[in-house]
């Protein structure tokens, strides 16, 4: 727990104090956000606001992980507190960094062209598929080599699983490794695009991501306290995951980094996360779902992202089939803007929806544990 607290604190402070530096640097470089002409009229006043702020909280998360991981060396149980970084950490941070890199290319092209059209859809899609495939393979083909004091292998879990999972793996829904990689690519694409579509109002995606990441920190830490690699727990209700403390540490670090960034990103935003931040957060959240064996729980934890994504899907299907639009504008937050809601009201109310999804998911997670124990 100390390591997680260290990671959260370091991430928050790095993000809080480095974001103003990023604002000055990006302003000097004229890295301002272009605004779509067809978007809400009230957004034109945001034109030129520094973007690519996701670089800050991605960097803060990595730095905080290093600090938190070093704190693990003070724990008495060297079996769990390995000094070297785990593959789990490399997969999760890799997903965040390289998904963010795809977004950075998109942001860079937007700034360079002075136009809201950056990386084309095919290029962005290819980048997401490549990131998902590479880290999906790593997650599924590299089992743990953790040993106990007698040199006996105690946990042979991979970061990911070939079994579809809700709160735990579901044995009846076993996939091939190729099928599992394809599933993971889909989850990465869904999560990155979900966060990206949500990132349309000041602080909206950042605040929602804080809740989702905090939920995963709690889930992973609970799994660590009831881990199958711990001989004090029986196989009936322990969790078969790999490196849950590392997962909790990274989730907590990312949540803390987002809180620090939110200080500057809340309305009126002085900086935007850009696709750099949105895709980076989406990649990390996808990795959290995979590594904690909660893939089918993700649509509930990230319920706001699902609702906003579905509003876009519904709008497209409706317009193409009937020629009519269901919403004034999609994604959903812009519909309410055009309906006369203030930006702050929309953000706070959508945060409430995000919080409800997180609360339901945590309730289901804990209820399943109680049912297993009972």
From Swiss-Prot:
UniProt-recorded Gene Ontology molecular function terms: metal ion binding; phospho-N-acetylmuramoyl-pentapeptide-transferase activity; UDP-N-acetylmuramoyl-L-alanyl-D-glutamyl-meso-2,6-diaminopimelyl-D-alanyl-D-alanine:undecaprenyl-phosphate transferase activity
Residue spans crossing the bilayer: 3-23, 52-72, 85-105, 125-145, 170-190, 201-221, 244-264, 271-291, 294-314, 350-370
UniProt cross-references to Pfam families, sorted A to Z: Glycos_transf_4, MraY_sig1
The keyword DNA-binding appears for this protein: no
A single GO cellular-component term on record: plasma membrane
Chemical reaction(s) catalysed: UDP-N-acetyl-alpha-D-muramoyl-L-alanyl-gamma-D-glutamyl-meso-2,6-diaminopimeloyl-D-alanyl-D-alanine + di-trans,octa-cis-undecaprenyl phosphate = di-trans,octa-cis-undecaprenyl diphospho-N-acetyl-alpha-D-muramoyl-L-alanyl-D-glutamyl-meso-2,6-diaminopimeloyl-D-alanyl-D-alanine + UMP
Major localisation: membrane
Keyword Cell inner membrane listed: no
Cofactor names: Mg(2+)
GO BP terms, alphabetized: cell division; cell wall organization; peptidoglycan biosynthetic process; regulation of cell shape
Pathway as given in its UniProt record: Cell wall biogenesis; peptidoglycan biosynthesis
Family statement: Belongs to the glycosyltransferase 4 family. MraY subfamily.
PANTHER family named in the record: PHOSPHO-N-ACETYLMURAMOYL-PENTAPEPTIDE-TRANSFERASE (PTHR22926), PHOSPHO-N-ACETYLMURAMOYL-PENTAPEPTIDE-TRANSFERASE HOMOLOG (PTHR22926:SF5)
Protein name: Phospho-N-acetylmuramoyl-pentapeptide-transferase
Organismal lineage: Bacteria, Bacillati, Actinomycetota, Actinomycetes, Micromonosporales
